[in-house]
Amino acid sequence: MAEETAERGENAYDWQSLMFLYNAAIKEVRTKLDIMNDEFQYIHQYNPIEYIKSRIKTPNSIAKKLSRHGLENTMENMVEHINDIAGVRIVCSFTSDIYRLAEMIGKQKEFTILYIKDYMKHPKESGYRSYHMLITVPIQTTNGINPTKVEIQIRTIAMAVSYTHLTLPTTSRV
């Protein structure tokens, strides 16, 4: 009984530590994006970023995704197989801004790009269009550097609106 309680306490601490890293990674990415947007305004008198949203996946959502992939709900599986626990969505006005922002993000020395999915050039069957980048961000803590994954999605306002319409349930009136 005491071992079980201690294990739950350890798991809670591990979970909190992991969420700390993901939150810190989102802060790092958002700070870089804000600076890039400010610099772009300074140089070109134009802001490519309309707005930025970020989120951490809920424990329930993570568990469901692991289950869909046939994986046991463990911290190791979560870190290894769920790439969008930390997510940042950038919404811009024009399609050209998407590629300009992706290029600027790719030039950030602190970010390591793990992969890119270009649903702009290759839309999903559902019509979904967006540009996804999975990066790692080095998070410096007192225990060292922790590379932490963040998924960045870049899309236009029009895509954000049309994706909402694609995913909302339809209701019919009789």
Mark where each language-model region is.
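Short cationic amphipathic helices and targeting signals
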Residues: 86-92, 152
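Conserved small/polar residues in nucleotide/adenosyl-binding loops
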Residues: 164-170
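Active-site ExK catalytic segment of metal-dependent nucleases
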Residues: 149-157
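Beta-rich nucleic-acid/ligand-interaction surfaces
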Residues: 99, 111-136
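Helix N-cap motif at beta-to-alpha junctions
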Residues: 94-97
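Charge-rich, low-complexity segments
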Residues: 1-81
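Short connector loops at helix/strand junctions that flank enzyme active sites
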Residues: 83-85, 128-130, 145-149
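Short amphipathic alpha-helices in soluble, non-transmembrane regions
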Residues: 101-106
